[in-house]
Each structure stands twice: as C-alpha cells, then as structure tokens.
C-alpha cells in the first residue's frame, strides 16, 4: 500500500551549464518540472560573472541551485569536472543557497544538431540540466513514498 505523500513546498531552481568562456543559465520550478532558458553569460572575469548571476538570483529568487557535473562518457572526471565543482562551491559560498549536481554528459550533444538552439546553446543545456534535476527529484520522492 502506498503511503500518502506529504505536501511538498514547491522549489524554484536555477541551473547552470558552466564553461570557462560561457555559462548557460535556466530557471524553473518543481510544479511544472520544466525549465526555461534565461541567458548565456559570456563574462570576461569571475567578478563580472558573479555580478550577473547575483542579478538573476535577485530577480528570480530561487531556493535551489543546480550545476551540471561534466564527466567523460564513462563517468570519469576530466579537466572541466574540477572547474564546475569549484564554480558550484563558489555559488554556494557567495549566495548561501544549496547546490545540487546533475550529470551533464550529453546535454550539449543532444542540442548541437538543433539549429534553433545554436544561438543560446549553453542556456538550453542548462534547461536540460534543470529538467534532469526535476526528474531525479521526482524519482527520489516516488521511491520514498513507496517505502
């Protein structure tokens, strides 16, 4: 018999597809489980990057941050793995918001063939990362409800 699920407070989340030249940003919520690409930040330095992020956080007021966790296809870390982890840790340290990590191995590859996505590829990748987060969140909640 399934246990009734407790009411869960909706989550507004902001996701990031981190890159050394550009950072894609998306926002969404756990009610619709959909993400919306916001922008791709091409900041010349980390101060400018975090200033842009601070403005987005003030506007959207998320209570959860999500960062793509890049790895090789076999799951092994590579040079961007440590950089993305550092970026996520900096987000947490600067803005005191929880950071969740989502496997982003194939997000850009899924979108690269779509001509409509090319102009804002990184923000659309962040959207896929965010939707994967909501999917995993759903799976975890359903597993707990069945226990």
Swiss-Prot record:
Entry GO terms, CC: cytosol
GO biological process: rRNA 5'-end processing
Molecular function GO labels: nuclease activity
Keyword Cytoplasm: yes
Gene3D superfamilies: YqgF/RNase H-like domain
The keyword Hydrolase belongs to this UniProt entry's keyword annotation: yes
Sequence similarity: Belongs to the YqgF nuclease family.
Protein name as annotated: Putative pre-16S rRNA nuclease
Native source species: Polynucleobacter necessarius subsp. necessarius (strain STIR1)
């Amino acid at each position: 018999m399934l246990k009734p699920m407790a009411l869960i407070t909706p989550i507004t989340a902001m996701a990031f597809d981190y890159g050394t030249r550009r950072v894609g940003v998306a926002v969404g919520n756990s009610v619709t489980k959909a993400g919306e690409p916001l922008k791709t930040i091409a900041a010349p330095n980390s101060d400018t990057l975090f200033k842009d992020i601070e403005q987005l956080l003030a506007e959207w007021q998320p209570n959860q941050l999500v960062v793509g966790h890049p790895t090789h296809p076999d799951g092994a870390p590579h040079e961007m793995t440590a950089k993305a982890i550092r970026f996520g840790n900096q987000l947490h340290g600067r803005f005191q918001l929880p950071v969740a990590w989502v496997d982003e191995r194939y997000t850009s590859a899924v979108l690269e063939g779509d001509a409509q996505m090319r102009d804002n590829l990184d923000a659309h990748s962040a959207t896929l990362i965010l939707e994967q987060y909501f999917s995993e969140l759903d799976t975890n909640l359903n597993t707990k409800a069945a226990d």
